[in-house]
């Protein structure tokens, strides 16, 4: 990741989509080197450079390595975000960011982002797009997965069949989604912000788990996309889909955590790597 080039963008506009979600539209010269992805879970790495860092004096080409000689406190934090939409004609990228009050890096930045404010990013990456060969589609996640789920729903053919489950704090956090007529979108309420609700509404007890595991399983080959809080997804929903429902890895490869309650992204990445190594050792 350190050697990947950084694209220089700036904030074009912001808009609140819900109490806990802000859309930030990015544009500028960075689009000259940014190549959009065809995946509906396309993601970028936002690089938050302090205003007092003179980027023009850093080694070129500009990568994360360019910041290596700065004091630790001045090295930019990096956060992974899903691309909601790319408007190639307007040369703009829309990124929908979940707000967690004053906590975190991306949320406070998005809440206070101003037009013309610079931001650097790497990417995009991605690995999932709904397979038209599937008989039906199962999509599920919390707020962090809404951009990818929304993009996937829009990419489905008009005659697609499926179910989507999205866990949010409450009714005010629902946003408008476009889906084929035969794809049922279900909003699941947890009763509060994901990082603040009691333990009996999070992790192994997240309402999303019950919503997915109690829904009627449709006939035919399913293509699965499930992302969100890691404990709920990786220790509950992934075993349910792969083991209990017997869905082959080809059709259920995109089931993973986007974040983990009580951990920063740096801590989460470390935990996720350790989990992958442990799972690899059991096979």
Curated annotation (Swiss-Prot):
GO terms for biological process: cellular response to iron ion starvation; iron import into cell; siderophore transport. GO terms for molecular function: FAD binding; ferric-chelate reductase (NADPH) activity. One of its GO terms (cellular component) is plasma membrane. This is Uncharacterized protein Rv2895c. Residues 4-131 form the FAD-binding FR-type domain. It comes from Mycobacterium tuberculosis (strain ATCC 25618 / H37Rv). InterPro entries: FAD-bd_9_SIP, FAD-bd_FR_type, FNR_nucleotide-bd, Riboflavin_synthase-like_b-brl, SIP_C, SIP_fam.
